[in-house]
């Protein structure tokens, strides 16, 4: 468990040091004895080693150049109660400002109970933090200035209220967050979508690639069906952790859309960075507008869901789908595929979404009864066709995340090509069948 220590140095670390094995051998030759298998201990010993002959600032510069991979570091020193060091590459790191005290944390959510003023470090940057002073440095050790952000009251005051769990609260918030999102993007009086600062002409975009991880990937899959149906663009979807390691053939006329609730998903951020390095058009669909992905993308489309604490995404999943649907509708209308009447009808239908969500949540007692049946299951299978297939994948993911039971999502038409062999006593099946062709 963190922190990991070496002599006078203690380190907490979020990320992965990819060359930890090589560094460990180097340090063992220097006489360091490792007490764990974690890559974090490598960092602690490395700092101790370089501190023998270097100033603190030069030590951090040398250590960061040795480390390969992603990390957010917090480092403290024995006997020095007024000193911390933070460093960032790939993983998020924020600095909080307080009266006669300062803080390090992964993001605004970690710091909100202590301060409403923060700064985010960018890749390669580090900081030396004292209670009344913070110095920021770039990779080479040159001093830099950082923008100070003020957190909103909503971010500072989010709690469970009368709910037992944050996730339960966030499920019930969905009708409200749907309305909030619609109000931000749809002008109800003029019947039009408002996406401000759209930096490209629609005619310059010939294809779209949607990229995400986990639940965000599922929202991308659903958006693929909508965009294929509503636009004349070529649409593709990729998992961020696969995209970043493939030989990608970048296209100048492609819009790359990155979906992430936190805006800090490491693989998604790495995929965005890859696109930025190749001068591609990039768009971020995020919940946290101060996040790394939001700061680096050309266009940011917030989902306006408010803070989501639950590990299993609920209201953010709805928000991601809603924003991607709105974007799909805007592109379709701008391409003159939708008539004005069809465009207005789609926007009008969206206005019913909040009340329909509320109606769905009112069947919670039925859901509780069904939940007891699934609690006794050997496994579960979720089936869907068309845009219901990604919903099936999401249902299976939720059951795995929350109940720790085996679940799989399949296209309904593939049932006969293998999965049917799993159907037996104790296997539960959920079929997603809305009142349309799917």
Identify the meaning behind each predicted range.
Residues 89-92, 101, 120, 223-229, ...:
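Short, solvent-exposed amphipathic alpha-helical segments in soluble enzyme
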Residues 1-160, 164-165, 176-183, 187-206, ...:
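Conserved short alpha-helical segments that host acidic/polar catalytic motifs at enzyme active sites
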């Amino acid at each position: 468990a963190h922190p990991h220590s070496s002599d006078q140095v203690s380190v907490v670390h979020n990320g992965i040091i990819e060359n930890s094995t090589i560094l460990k051998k180097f340090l063992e030759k220097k006489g360091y004895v490792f007490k764990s298998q974690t890559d974090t201990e490598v960092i602690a010993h490395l700092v101790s080693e370089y501190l023998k002959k270097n100033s603190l600032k030069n030590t951090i510069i040398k250590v960061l150049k040795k480390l390969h991979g992603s990390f957010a570091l917090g480092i403290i020193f024995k006997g020095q109660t007024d000193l911390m060091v933070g460093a960032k590459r790939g993983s998020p790191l924020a600095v909080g400002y307080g009266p006669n005290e300062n803080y390090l944390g992964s993001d605004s959510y970690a710091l909100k109970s202590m301060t409403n003023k923060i700064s985010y470090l960018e890749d390669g940057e580090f900081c030396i933090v004292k209670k009344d002073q913070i110095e920021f440095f770039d990779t080479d050790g040159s001093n830099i200035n950082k923008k100070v952000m003020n957190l909103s009251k909503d971010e500072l005051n989010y709690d469970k209220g009368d709910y037992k769990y944050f996730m339960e609260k966030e499920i019930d918030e969905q009708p409200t967050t749907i309305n909030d999102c619609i109000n931000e993007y749809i002008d109800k009086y003029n019947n039009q979508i408002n996406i401000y600062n759209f930096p490209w002409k629609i005619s310059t975009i010939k294809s779209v690639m949607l990229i995400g991880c986990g639940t965000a990937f599922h929202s991308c899959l659903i958006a693929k069906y909508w965009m294929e149906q509503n636009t004349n663009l070529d649409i593709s979807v990729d998992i961020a952790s696969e995209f970043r390691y493939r030989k990608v053939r970048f296209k100048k006329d492609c819009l790359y859309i990155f979906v992430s609730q936190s805006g800090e998903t490491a693989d998604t951020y790495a995929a965005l960075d890859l696109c930025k390095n190749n001068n591609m058009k990039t768009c971020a669909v995020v919940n946290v507008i101060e996040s790394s992905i939001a700061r680096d993308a050309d266009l940011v489309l917030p989902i306006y869901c408010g803070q989501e604490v639950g590990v299993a995404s609920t209201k953010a999943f709805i928000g991601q789908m809603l924003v991607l649907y709105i974007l799909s509708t805007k592109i379709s209308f701008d391409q003159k595929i939708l008539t004005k009447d069809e465009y207005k009808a789609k926007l009008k239908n969206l206005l019913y979404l909040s009340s329909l969500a509320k109606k769905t949540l009112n069947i919670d007692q039925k859901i509780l009864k069904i939940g007891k049946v699934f609690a006794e299951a050997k496994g579960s299978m979720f089936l869907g066709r068309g845009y219901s297939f990604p919903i099936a994948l999401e249902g299976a993911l939720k059951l795995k995340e929350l109940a720790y039971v085996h679940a799989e999502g399949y296209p309904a038409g593939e049932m006969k090509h293998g999965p049917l062999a799993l159907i037996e006593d104790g296997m539960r099946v959920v079929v997603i069948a809305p009142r349309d062709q799917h």
